[in-house]
Every structure is written in C-alpha cells, then in structure tokens.
Amino acid sequence: MKLFSCLMALLLFLLQAVPGLGLPRDTSRCVGYHGYCIRSKVCPKPFAAFGTCSWRQKTCCVDTTSDFHTCQDKGGHCVSPKIRCLEEQLGLCPLKRWTCCKEI
C-alpha cells in the first residue's frame, strides 16, 4: 500500500510538472486524501465515498482503515469557512476549505 501511495505521488508530481497535463481539481483532492477514483457510484468495503473525480464522472473512495477519517465518522460536523468553530476536530470534509467542528 505504501509503494502504491509513493507511485501515485510521483505520478501526480510528474503530471503537474508538464503544462497542460494536470489532473482535474477534484481528482487531485481525492488523491491528496489518499483516495482512489472508481467508476462505480458505490465504494467497496473498507472504502467510503468522499466526493467525485474526473469532472464528476467517477467516485472518490477513501480507505477507512487508514489514519484519514471523514468528519462525520468522528462525530463532527462540516461547516463553511464563514462559521467559526468553538472546538475544531480532525477529519476530512468533502468541500474545499470547510472545517470539521466538534462544537459550533
């Protein structure tokens, strides 16, 4: 699994180095969260759906057995940047710049 992550990071770096060959933004975000883009609308276990990839044509699936957890898995709530958290919490939110809050 570590080798695959390293290879994906290298591929992402090379794609960004060549003008015009960058990944779509949603795909880059998925890979940044150690996710995988699949064609199915449902992720296989132990993966959880976490947004989209390839211009919303594929589903981003994040491994739930890793250290990366969605905000709701940890009992938090994703809030927009306009809302201040009383207590922030670690966790991934599907929308860019949103924050995972334990208490709002």
Swiss-Prot record:
GO terms for cellular component: extracellular space. GO terms for biological process: defense response to Gram-negative bacterium; defense response to Gram-positive bacterium; innate immune response in mucosa. It comes from the Eukaryota. Residues 1-22 form the signal peptide. It is found in: Secreted; Cytoplasmic granule. One of its GO terms (molecular function) is CCR6 chemokine receptor binding. The keyword Chaperone does not apply. Its main location: secreted. Detected in outer membrane of the vitelline layer of the egg (at protein level). Expressed in the liver, gall bladder, kidney, testis, ovary and male and female reproductive tracts. Expressed in the ovarian stroma, but not in the ovarian follicles. No expression is detected in bone marrow. CDD domains: BDD1_Gal11, BDD2_Gal11. Keywords: Antibiotic, Antimicrobial, Defensin, Disulfide bond, Secreted, Signal. Disulfide bonds join 30-60, 37-53, 43-61. Belongs to the beta-defensin family. Has bactericidal activity. PANTHER family: BETA-DEFENSIN 1, BETA-DEFENSIN-RELATED. This is Gallinacin-11. It comes from Gallus gallus (Chicken).
